[in-house]
Design a protein with these regions (language model features):
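Conserved GNAT acetyl-CoA-binding A-motif
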Residues: 117-119, 146-159
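Conserved acetyl-CoA-binding loop-helix of GNAT-fold acetyltransferases
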Residues: 126, 132-145, 169
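Active-site rim helix/loop that mediates acceptor-substrate recognition in acyltransferases
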Residues: 34-56
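A short beta-loop-alpha structural element at the N-terminal edge
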Residues: 2-16, 20
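C-terminal "cap" of GNAT-fold acetyltransferases
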Residues: 152, 156-161, 180-205
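Conserved beta-hairpin
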Residues: 49-69
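Conserved active-site alpha-helix within GNAT-family acetyltransferase domains
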Residues: 137, 149-151, 160-177, 183-184
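Conserved acyl-donor/pantetheine-binding loop and adjacent beta-alpha core of acyl/acetyltransferases
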Residues: 66-125, 131, 181-182
Length: 205
């Protein structure tokens, strides 16, 4: 997998991939149901700007697939970005939509484990034009190799049950489930314990 760390210079490409990848997602298509495309793009750009504070947003060379990680001890948004996110929600979604989005985010926060330090996979998406070639899972597998080298654990939320088995094949196990408000979809949380790097083969004289 030819992957690299994304920077702010890649924001346009990364944001387009994530926005299109999650356009039909059971959770986020409902949470962002009212804004036009420009409004939805503003949400994703702000979210990604928060993640790009860390060197853990990964992309294939042309941005066909993107993974967004928050490293141990990190936050998805700075306090200033959180305030901007709330203002954007109110202006784009209206009071009722902003209230729903706030309730959705509260569900994610409540379910998130806060014991053992871990890498948090906030987003993983493949551009629709490049789906079906395993790029997203290959990028995730590459990232996990780096996380394993640190002996760190990893956590994610699966907003689409069709992906659960794919995550399980990479070592994630069921951690829990929660329902979103107003009879919203079920989100599955998954945990991958820390592992050491693969041992080097023993060379015999």
């Amino acid at each position: 997998m030819d992957a690299r760390v994304a920077t702010l210079a890649d924001l346009d490409v990364v944001a387009e991939t994530i926005q299109l990848a999650f356009a039909d997602d059971p959770v986020w298509s409902r949470a962002f149901a009212h804004p036009d495309d420009r409004g939805v793009a503003a949400f994703w750009r702000l979210w990604l700007e928060g993640a790009l504070r860390y060197p853990w947003v990964w992309m294939t060379q042309a941005g066909e697939a993107v993974s967004v990680w928050i490293p141990p001890g990190g936050d998805e948004l700075s306090p200033e970005q959180e305030a901007a996110f709330k203002r954007l929600a109110e202006s784009s979604l209206g009071r009722r939509g902003a209230s729903y989005l706030d309730a959705v985010m509260a569900c994610f926060t409540e379910a998130h484990p806060h014991g053992e330090p871990h890498y948090y996979l906030s987003l993983l998406g493949t551009h629709p034009a490049h789906r079906g070639h395993g790029l997203g899972m290959a990028l995730l597998a590459e990232n996990l190799t780096r996380i394993d080298a640190e002996g760190a654990a990893a956590y994610l939320e699966s907003s689409n049950s069709a992906n659960d088995q794919r995550y399980q094949r990479l070592g994630f196990a069921l951690h829990g489930r929660f329902n979103l408000p107003d009879d919203g979809p079920i989100v599955t949380t998954m945990w991958r314990p820390g592992r050491g790097p693969e041992p080097s083969p023993i060379r015999r004289p």
